[in-house]
């Protein structure tokens, strides 16, 4: 549709109508910039001109980048046109922070699904990277050494109890589920017991500053620190532990390596408005 003016004669009077321009796209990183790492199936910044994922199709192992629609949603039509009735595996999840920290997996059997037999994998109607089938790891190494100040979150669906789901970190898990009933944050047992180990569609968010560590599930404070071990080890994205593999689907994960504790509510609202988690 062209933008401009159009005239129409009504009862002898010329009336001019002005076409209304659509609102400009605004992503979460426009509102809360300077992320260290940012992965998502939605566009996160108006200034980001890259793609969301690189996908390998099972029919001939060809690969193609998959980007976004003007509204910021993943281009599902491009994805299904490329993959067809086959399976589509993620070989690269692009970092939208501008720091080039792309998560890459070159081993075919360890690549998670995004399309299964022609159907885009989803949670709550929104595309999701599916670790259920591969059940292994998808990572990059040594992005950065985390400082004390941090806001970190992921949007995921953990589907099988008893498997580690370490979204970020290796060694002492930076952020993720260590076992059936323990969530680790910054190398500490942040939350032990009292939650459903499969969890379903969940926003897990952690904040850290020099004096306080907090973890939230769906905007509810669940912090109960039991250990005091500091985080150590390399930085991985969606790691596994002792070959237990991952179990679930992931849609988004961002780290701000700075103090955004005051922005937690706004960040949570932005995420929940898009994904409809709680």
Predicted features along the sequence, with ranges:
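Extracellular low-complexity Ser/Thr/Asn/Gly-rich intrinsically disordered segments
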Residues: 1-29, 106, 155, 167-168, ...
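N-terminal low-complexity, intrinsically disordered "leader/linker" segments enriched in small/polar
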Residues: 1-72, 78, 267-270
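Extracellular glycan-interaction patches encoded by glycine-rich segments
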Residues: 190-192, 229-257
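Short, hydrophobic/proline-enriched secondary-structure or compact coil segments at domain edges
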Residues: 47-59, 129, 167-168, 233-236
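Extracellular, beta-strand-rich glycan-interacting domains
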Residues: 3-5, 44-47, 52-59, 69, ...
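Extracellular glycan-interaction surfaces
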Residues: 41-42, 82-86, 91-135, 143-146, ...
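Early transmembrane alpha-helices of polytopic membrane proteins
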Residues: 37, 74-80, 89, 93, ...
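The right-handed parallel beta-helix/beta-solenoid scaffold, focusing on the short coil/turn
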Residues: 51, 127, 211-213, 233, ...
